[in-house]
Amino acid sequence: QFEPDDIIELAQGEEVTARLVKTFSDDNWKVFFSPLSEEDFADVPEKWSVLVQNLEQWSTELGQLWNKFGFIPQWQRDDIMVSYAPKGGSVGKHYDEYDVFLVQGYGHRRWQLGKWCDSSTEFKPNQPIRIFDDMGDLVIDEVMNPGDILYIPARMSHYGVAEDDCLTFSFGLRYPNLADIFDNVNKAFCHQDPELNLSEFQLPLRLTQSEQSTGKLADENIQAMKKQFLAKLAESEAFDALFKQAVAGTVSSRRYEMLVSDEMSDPDEVRSILEEEQGVLMQDNNCKLLYTENPLRIYANGEWLDEVNVIEAEVLKRLSDSEALDWAFLNNLVNDTEDPESTMELLLDSICNWLDDGWVLIE
């Protein structure tokens, strides 16, 4: 679908996240960030590379390739990145903090994988990107052809060099960090299940009194509060529910702002496509959609959807599991309700909202 000129043109878009890496020598690298322009590409050295993030935003078809990685839970997905480089182009020897699957889409690229890295790994000084020279003993040294896939674990050193004009697509994974979870715990306290009783967190802490200076907050008092704080978190069922909500909100959030169309979907048109044209409803993989159980809760792009009804929750749950839903399934689902026709009308309205928000698509 994509060719090199497509990526160069896409990288110059106003709302695109891209980087242009120019290699003037082994010790002279320059990086240019979005927004990129024609002038940036008019003055490139022999070796250079451009990387575009969040391709799901710009290609629905490419985003659906995530379904080929069904063994990866949706909450671990980050985004799809593409790297274009002419012969000799590279981003240097480096490592990443996340796992990645590389898919060669066009041309050929030579990949070398070497030693494991960590926070003590030394990088080349005075460079705008984290690169190094020493990869240790190579464990892989292969040329990837179109259609080949290479898995690179987090913190494994790697080095990719274009053999000719080539495009490599990176399906990146990620795990949450504690700072993001802490932030979402606070959000969960502000937006929690109204049936959840949080009164236990409003009780004053019990501290042993001791003689101390009037203005001093003693370290032993702070440590005593910390001990009670951690003990309460470990034993509280209410906090378990909040923590589940916080984690789900964290891992369902998108790293990049989601762009949506101004067009409004029409329920009658959606019904016609599904019922008469045998269309199927699918998740748009530009959206992060997932659920937790006990009880069933749906999350989309970092938000808990606390207002969806039982029918909508079932549809979104199945979509998040990569199911394609046809009219027969939707019809059977609403036929089990007291008022099937009204329920279907409400569901079609919701599907239109999901289409407008970029959560789902119809094929």
Task: For every predicted segment, state its role.
Residues 234-320, 352, 363:
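Acidic, low-complexity/disordered tracts enriched in E/D and polar residues
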Residues 188-249:
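Long, charge-rich alpha-helical interaction segments
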Residues 67, 105-106, 187, 227, ...:
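A broad, structural surface signal
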Residues 304-363:
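Long, charge-rich, low-complexity alpha-helical segments
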Residues 1-44, 74, 217-220, 224, ...:
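Fe(II)/2-oxoglutarate oxygenase catalytic core
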Residues 154-157, 283-285:
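Glycine-rich, charged/polar anion/phosphate-binding loops
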Residues 1-148, 156-209:
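Active-site region of the double-stranded beta-helix
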